[in-house]
Amino acid sequence: MKKPEVHFHSRHESGNTLYILGMVRDVLRKQRRYTDFNNLRDAVLNAGSYEEALQLMNGYVILIDDDGLYDLRKGV
């Protein structure tokens, strides 16, 4: 299964970790991946940094920063 893309703007409201997590939640719910989301949510809430949280979420979807600050294809 191809990972869906989730776009965000790191310099704006949609760059907030919880905002991004909500967008990822919506994608995973549509795919009925409830357990995956629960595990991801717990990991993100325990992440030590913004970058770590992005990397965790990027494991489930393709995160794309439309502001260009974070290139998650190469690592944060």
For the regions a protein language model found, what residue spans apply to each?
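Long, contiguous binding/interaction regions
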Residues: 1-76
